[in-house]
Amino acid sequence: MRKRNVRGICAFLCTILLECLIPAGEVQAQRALDVARERGYQLEERYQPAGSIITEINTGQILWQENAQKQWPPASMTKLMTILLAYEEIKAGNLELESTAEVNERYTDIAGRYALSNNKMQPGASYTVAELMDLIIVPSSAAATYMLADMVESDPDRFVERMNQKAQELGMVNTKYFNCVGVTNNLLQPYHPVSQPLDGDNITTPEAVSYTH
């Protein structure tokens, strides 16, 4: 519950920053939390983002940035890379949005782990690629991410290699993936990529995950 509350506050801070429409050059000395407080919002210090960036999607113009090159764990944003790789497989003709996968004991085990964001899964149930993508976005399902990743690449270690290769292709410097979910590998045992360390935690920067056309 606390994680969801923090996410909501961070989204709220982004909204405040967008409303301010302050040129990036004028806000470098200010923190996101300070901007919100100046406008009458009383927020605790723990809601100050470690780093942030807001860009105009079509032009790439930076509207706001704060510690945009600071490395930090992307958490569930990691799962977007799985969706991207799945779309590439669709484009290559290796997958379709209607392609299906069946829930097995591995996926139900992952779905039952309370330390992970998930959805309930019943053994034998089938999901299409499109349905798995929806579950990855909301409710950020770890089990759905595993299912989709396995459809793209059956070897978890090879899948992580592909994640890192794609990150390099996209120019995502200072980024390293250790798994497809966005938690430390010890929370995923025994399903973590065995070539990766148990304390491996994905790392990136706000700048690397900002999106523009």
Residue ranges and their predicted role:
Residues 2-12:
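Bacterial N-terminal signal peptides that target proteins for export
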